Amino acid sequence: MREIVHLQTGQCGNQIGTKFWEIISDEHGIQPTGEYTGADKDLMELQLERINVYYNEGNQGKYVPRAVLVDLEPGTMDSVRAGPHGQLFKPDSFVFGQSGAGNNWAKGHYTEGAELVDSVLDVVRKEAEKCDCLQGFQLTHSLGGGTGSGMGTLLVSKIREEFPDRIMNTFSVVPSPKVSDTVVEPYNATLSIHQLVENTDETYCIDNEALYDICFRTLKLQNPTYGDLNHLVSLTMSGVTTCFRFPGQLNADLRKLAVNMVPFPRLHFFMPGFAPLTARGSQQYRALTVPELTQQMFDAKNMMAACDPRHGRYLTVAAIFRGRMSMKEVDEQMYNIQNKNSSFFVEWIPNNVKTAVCDIPPRGIKMASTFIGNSTAIHELFKRVGEQFTAMFRRKAFLHWYTGEGMDEMEFTEAESNMNDLVSEYQQYQEATADDEAEFEEEGEVEGEYA
């Protein structure tokens, strides 16, 4: 089977990662003890057919997540272990330090994290060796802190060195000004993005601001907690990985998804979305129709990144529908969306919307859909972080925390310009048209005549 090794680093990464395991264990009929208790025979086949993508089968028929949990302080690990699904993970999967990274990217990447990284790689190597045919890695982390961002990107580059031909996929929580934990988030995020541009194949940008907006506006929650935000993230992660976990034809592994979604290697930052949005613990009373799902899924309010897709154009889109529904209706709806909103899709990539359907819906809903868009509007997110970075870096504010760990100012300048380049690349393709090439050729000919 095509296995995926899952890594989670830092407090945020461990919390959304653990929530992800809770949800997919539930979908595959796996108890917190690791035992399989399926319902009927038909469902059992579906649940277990591709269970090996995320789980190892241990002794006594127990299923163990192929996960590596990493942090530079023991706190989050202890709460995962004490939580309802703590017994699911095997003890060797927990790798932690004692000192913490103190929201400092340099500590995570160069000092504290670098000391721990070899023991993490040992666990990763052991997991990879047990695989029949490893397809790649997925990492959950945040870009605003120290461990997830600094050590997360260090792990990514080390794994890239050791497994250069495997796909690297990250779920990255991007900081936002409205929901800020630390003042140095723009530094940590910019230094991380500098790494992610070069070393990952697919990055899902999840944005706290967008998640808060969804909680306020759509779910009508008065004071949302991180638990509510993580619930939204895990719904999306479960949806995005549906194609890998259940039998299906489209985007059935990380590489196929990358081939469909990434037109240029640097532009691999995706905007995820989900429909229907429901609050934790609430059940939906009315089943949505396929047109409603499609409508909601493309709506800016349902995006998990705080960018407005109407301000850019889609390079590529993947949609995953879940539940029992007519394939014909799904295709018609997706076709309609492209026709009615053709100006929002670049015309120089024909057929740039791919759709997959999986029979098994998420728990408690009849039908759901997940959206993955590679939109040029994501440059708004990078621009926002870049502006905050520049404001502080111009005054060299807080820089001594980083140079004290042995970093050089030059590295900040490089990260800043790499992010600015990324923004202008997205803008360039947003304005590109299918006729650009032809225009250049004509100009060349005209010059030739006068020569």
UniProtKB/Swiss-Prot annotation:
Keyword set, alphabetical order: Cytoplasm, Cytoskeleton, GTP-binding, Magnesium, Metal-binding, Microtubule, Nucleotide-binding
GO-annotated biological processes: microtubule-based process
Cofactor: Mg(2+)
Keyword Metal-binding: yes
Subcellular localization, as worded in the UniProt entry: Cytoplasm, Cytoskeleton
GO cellular component, one term: microtubule
Disordered, as annotated region: 430-451
Binding site for GTP: Q11, E73, S142, G146, T147, G148, N208, N230
Biased amino acid composition, Acidic residues: 433-451
Family label: Belongs to the tubulin family.
Role according to the record: Tubulin is the major constituent of microtubules, a cylinder consisting of laterally associated linear protofilaments composed of alpha- and beta-tubulin heterodimers. Microtubules grow by the addition of GTP-tubulin dimers to the microtubule end, where a stabilizing cap forms. Below the cap, tubulin dimers are in GDP-bound state, owing to GTPase activity of alpha-tubulin.
Name this polypeptide is given: Tubulin beta-1 chain
